[in-house]
């Protein structure tokens, strides 16, 4: 299967002196908080790419998932995109979307998102003429009901 040492450190670089190291707020937190390296203003209904000035190498067979922070979600702030591929080595940016009614200010050093490391599988794709049937079939959005 996967030959991955879970005790191997993940290497990262602070690209500028404005960068702050990713941190976990508790020993069992799923994600590492990412910090803004700059000040930004995001008007209602707008989005902004927030630079962390951090670059890192993902562990083999892993990718980084940028996830929202619950406290920001309560304020109407969401994440756009959010995948860091195993072979990406550039500045990690986070797209913040302001779904709120007020302007949202991001200050240097604010926690803006969390980075969660997840295993990934690279399957070989095979085109076929049809798929095996299931009870659900092609029933999609809302088809399983609310209860």
UniProtKB/Swiss-Prot annotation:
Cofactor: Mg(2+)
Ranges in coiled-coil conformation: none
Tagged with keyword Metal-binding: yes
Pfam family, one: dUTPase
Reactions the enzyme catalyzes: dUTP + H2O = dUMP + diphosphate + H(+)
Annotated GO biological process: dUMP biosynthetic process; dUTP catabolic process
Family, per entry: Belongs to the dUTPase family.
Name under which the protein is recorded: Deoxyuridine 5'-triphosphate nucleotidohydrolase
Gene field: OPG046
């Amino acid at each position: 299967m996967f030959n991955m040492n879970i005790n191997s450190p993940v290497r990262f670089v602070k690209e500028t002196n404005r960068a702050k190291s990713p941190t976990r707020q508790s020993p069992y937190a799923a994600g590492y908080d990412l910090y803004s390296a700059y000040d930004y203003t995001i008007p209602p209904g707008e989005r902004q790419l927030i630079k962390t000035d951090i670059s890192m190498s993902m562990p083999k067979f892993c990718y980084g998932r940028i996830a929202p922070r619950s406290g920001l979600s309560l304020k109407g702030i969401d994440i756009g995109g959010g995948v860091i591929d195993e072979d990406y080595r550039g500045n990690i940016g986070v797209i913040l979307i302001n779904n709120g009614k007020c302007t949202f200010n991001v200050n240097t050093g604010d926690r803006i998102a969390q980075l969660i490391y997840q295993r990934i599988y690279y399957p070989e794709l095979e085109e076929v003429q049809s798929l095996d049937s299931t009870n659900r079939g092609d029933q999609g959005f809302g088809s399983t009901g609310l209860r």
